[in-house]
Amino acid sequence: MKEPMKDRAKELALDQLVKVLDRVPLVSSVKNDLGELRSLLYLRRPPRVVALGLGSSGRSTLLRSLIERRPVRHPLDTDHGDWVQIEHEGAKVDWLEIDVDDPAARSQWTHALDEKVPDLVFLTFEPRNVQDAKPIAERAKSLLADLPDGAGALRVFTLLTHSDLIGRGPVEVEAERRVLEAALEECGLDADPPRAVSAISGHGLAALSEAMVLALPEETRLEAARALTRAQEARLRIGNEIVQACTSVSVTVGVTPIPFSDMVVLGPLQALMVSALAYLSGRGLDKKTVAEWLGSLGVVGGLGMGLRFSAQTIAKLVPGAGNVIAAGVAGAGTTAMGQSAIRYFLKN
């Protein structure tokens, strides 16, 4: 219960920031940047993933390997046929497993769609299922045809699981993958080319994680990148998007001729930026973390940020070019703070 309350408080803080900006001249161009931040940060929700396949095709093991921070003694609770809200050490995923050979598969799928529409699909095959891939894919294709009007086509990731059990090396794995690909093409399933993955060795999971984040809707990307521990490129990309959006707002605020508007707007905005980057990394922004981050800046970095704030406030008191100087200082200060947070939270 505490986390939704914190999220609501942050959303209200962003709303207050928008109201402040509404009273400041020359900020209409900033609404797009704030809209992007709202979609990414406060309209965020967990990704919804449906895993179709046979009961022994390694779906739960795959999920655990995708989101796991450290080994756990007990398996994740992934009941078949119903949506399950997985929460594991900060990772959040709405997960649905359906066995396509189960007589109840159709009714389970229909009931699940009444609850929520998935964002993407896993269709899993273990090596011993490859020879029977066509009927499995045809059952999955039949289920996917039941998506409600307006839902759009779902991105389907076909996965050859337990790839570490195939032959003696990558040549045999690729040969098996091609057999699976041919079977899927024959049945006409609209899906990505099969990916060979292993929950044990981790083979293929980094590329799968990155592809998942790219395929997901905007409002799920932050939670997805946070959950998928191997999606390091996605985390950096989203982190830089957050910094760029906040920098754009900072520059616009810096252009305004009102002294000390930086204190009203830039402080909350930069706090929002750093807390978002910490959240993206999977870490909380408590006092200890803040102290460690500030310590990582060093004396020069900390003084530099303080001097930037003083300079941009003083510059606004200078007629004419002072606002331009303040805008440059505000943007540079926000960028520097954001990049230092990226280095600490996302690159360490």
Q: What residue ranges belong to the model's regions?
A:
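Conserved G1/Walker A P-loop phosphate-binding module
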Residues: 2-96, 275, 284, 339
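Switch II of P-loop NTPase G domains
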Residues: 92-148
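Membrane-inserting effector segments that mediate pore formation, membrane fusion
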Residues: 242-280, 284-334
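Residue-level signature of catalytic and energy-coupling elements of molecular machines
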Residues: 62, 122, 258, 274, ...
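Canonical P-loop GTPase G-domain recognition
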Residues: 152-157, 162-225
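Flexible loop/N-cap segments at domain edges
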Residues: 231, 298, 302, 341
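C-terminal-of-GTPase-core extension/linker across diverse P-loop GTPases
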Residues: 22-30, 40, 48-51, 201-251
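Hydrophobic alpha-helical transmembrane segments of membrane transport and translocation systems
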Residues: 335-348
